C-alpha cells in the first residue's frame, strides 16, 4: 500500500547526495506508520499498570548498496528510554528519550522523542505533549494524515514525527469531538536553504461518528505544509511552507475481516509554481484503501489522487537534474495519482514475519518495491532484513533516485 511509499523512498535515499535527498520530498509521497488514537480511551489506564514503567530499546542499523563495494551508505544506533505512569485514577504520563549516533558522520544527538500527559473524565480527555495524532483512514496517502510530518529522505526512523500538541476529545456516546492545536509545527529541513514559515501554529477540528461496522468523520482547520514548496522566482530559489485551509471527510466500512476506507480533502492555499512565480492554489485530494484478509495473510490496496481545479499550462514543479543537481521546471499535470499494493504474512508459528510492497505513480514515472523479513529471535531481540529498489523516469520529480537499490539489516534489543 501507500504505507510503504515513504518507507521506501526514505530508505533507498539514504545515500543520495544531500542536496537531492530532501529537495525531492513532497507531501504527496507521505507514508509509513499507522496512527492510533487509543490512548484517549479510559480502558487503557489499566493496561499501563500491567507493564514495566521503564523500558530500554537499542537499534543498530546498517544499509548497503549492492551495486557498490565501498563503505556502507548508512550506519546508525538509536537508544530509547521510555517511562510511563498513571496519574491517579484518571490520567497517565509517558516520555520517550532518544539518543542517536550516526557512525558515518560521527554526529551524536539527543532529544525528547515523545512525551505526553493525559487527564481523562467520563466525557472527555485532555492531552498535552509531543505525540502522534491520527487523522484520516487511508494511512500514508497524505490526504488527511497531515498533522505529523513524514520523515526526511535521510532519516533512518521511517515513522511519522511526533509534534507538540494540545488536544481535547469530547465523547457523546458514539459521537466524538476533537479540538487540537500544534504549538510548533515541524517542516522538512533542506540543507543550505532556509524555509519561510507562513504560520507558527496549526489548529484542527474533527467530528467523528462511530456506527456498527463503520464510522465517518468531518474535518476543518488551518495547517502548515509539512514539506515546503520549492520554487524558482526570477531564477532564484525560494522555499516556503505555506499556510492552507482544510475541509475534509473520511469513511470506513468493515465487512467481515475486511476494511474499506475513503478520504477526501479540499485544501486552499498550497504552494505551486505558476509561470515565474511561487503562488498559492486550491487542490482536491482523495484516496481509496482496502485491507483484505485471506486466512492469516493480509492484503492492502490503495489509490490516491490530487486534482488542481485552477490548472493552466503555466503550472510546473521544480525538479533536480540527477547528474548536475541543478534545478529546472517540469510541467505539472492537472491530475496526479499514486497506487500501492502490499501483502504480509508470517510463518514458523509467528517467529518470522514478512511483507512485500509495490508502490508508484499511475503514469509509470516512478515505481518502487520494498520487502521486509522480521525474525523474532527471542523476547528481547528482533532482526529486520530489508531489500528495496526504485526506478524513475528522467523527467520525473524523483529522477535522481532512478536505479537505486538498498539492502539493510537492523537489530532491535529490548531490555
What is each of the regions a protein language model found here?
Residues 16-71, 78, 155, 176:
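N-terminal periplasmic/intermembrane-space "pro-region" immediately following the signal or transit peptide
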Residues 54, 89-95, 123-126, 174-179, ...:
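Repeated loop/turn-to-beta-strand initiation elements of outer-membrane beta-barrel proteins
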Residues 58-64, 95-99, 128-130, 179-183, ...:
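Transmembrane beta-barrel strands of outer-membrane/channel proteins
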Residues 75-81, 111-115, 162-166, 201-205, ...:
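Hydrophobic, lipid-facing positions within transmembrane beta-strands of outer-membrane proteins
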Residues 87-188, 208, 390-392:
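Outer membrane beta-barrel
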Residues 252-359:
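Detector for outer-membrane/organellar transmembrane beta-barrel domains
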Residues 389, 401-415:
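Outer-membrane beta-barrel "beta-signal"
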Amino acid at each position: 500500500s501507500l504505507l510503504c511509499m515513504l518507507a521506501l523512498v526514505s530508505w533507498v535515499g539514504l545515500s543520495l547526495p544531500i542536496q537531492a535527498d530532501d529537495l525531492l520530498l513532497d507531501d504527496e509521497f507521505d507514508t509509513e506508520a499507522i496512527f492510533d488514537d487509543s490512548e484517549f480511551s479510559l480502558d487503557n489506564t489499566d493496561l499501563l499498570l500491567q507493564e514495566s514503567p521503564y523500558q530500554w530499546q537499542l537499534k543498530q542499523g546498517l544499509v548497503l548498496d549492492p551495486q557498490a563495494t565501498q563503505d556502507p551508505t548508512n550506519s546508525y544506533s538509536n537508544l530509547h528510554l521510555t517511562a510511563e505512569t498513571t496519574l491517579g485514577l484518571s490520567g497517565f504520563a509517558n516520555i520517550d528519550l532518544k539518543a542517536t549516533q550516526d557512525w558515518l558522520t560521527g554526529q551524536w544527538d539527543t532529544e525528547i522523542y515523545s512525551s505526553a500527559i493525559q487527564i481523562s473524565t467520563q466525557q472527555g480527555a485532555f492531552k498535552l505533549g509531543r505525540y502522534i495524532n491520527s487523522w484520516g483512514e487511508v494511512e500514508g496517502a497524505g490526504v488527511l494524515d497531515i498533522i505529523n510530518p513524514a520523515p526526511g529522505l535521510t532519516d533512518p526512523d521511517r515513522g511519522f514525527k511526533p509534534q507538540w500538541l494540545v488536544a481535547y476529545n469530547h465523547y457523546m456516546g458514539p459521537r466524538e469531538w476533537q479540538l487540537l492545536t500544534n504549538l510548533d509545527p515541524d517542516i522538512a529541513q533542506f540543507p543550505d536553504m532556509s524555509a519561510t514559515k507562513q504560520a507558527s501554529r496549526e489548529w484542527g477540528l474533527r467530528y467523528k461518528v462511530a456506527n456498527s461496522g463503520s464510522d465517518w468523520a468531518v474535518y476543518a482547520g488551518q495547517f502548515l505544509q509539512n514539506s515546503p514548496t520549492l520554487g524558482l522566482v526570477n531564477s532564484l530559489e525560494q522555499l516556503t511552507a505555506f499556510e492552507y485551509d482544510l475541509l475534509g471527510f473520511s469513511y470506513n466500512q468493515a465487512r467481515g475481516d475486511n476494511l474499506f476506507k475513503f478520504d477526501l480533502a479540499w485544501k486552499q492555499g498550497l504552494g505551486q509554481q505558476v509561470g515565474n512565480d511561487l503562488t498559492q492554489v486550491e487542490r482536491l485530494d482523495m484516496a481509496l484503501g482496502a485491507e483484505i484478509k485471506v486466512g492469516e495473510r493480509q492484503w492492502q490496496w490503495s489509490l490516491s489522487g490530487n486534482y488542481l481545479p485552477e490548472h493552466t499550462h503555466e503550472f510546473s514543479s521544480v525538479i533536480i537534474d540527477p547528474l548536475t543537481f541543478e534545478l529546472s521546471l517540469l510541467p505539472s499535470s492537472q491530475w496526479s495519482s499514486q497506487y500501492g499494493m502490499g501483502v504480509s504474512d508470517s510463518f514458523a508459528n509467528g517467529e518470522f514475519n514478512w511483507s512485500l510492497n509495490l508502490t508508484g505513480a499511475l503514469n509509470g514515472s516512478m515505481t518502487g518495491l520494498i520487502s521486509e523479513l522480521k525474525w523474532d529471535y527471542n523476547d528481547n531481540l528482533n532482526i529486520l532484513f530489508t531489500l528495496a529498489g526504485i526506478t524513475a523516469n528522467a523527467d520525473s520529480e524523483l529522477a535522481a533516485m532512478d536505479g537505486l537499490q538498498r539492502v539493510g539489516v537492523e537489530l532491535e534489543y529490548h531490555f
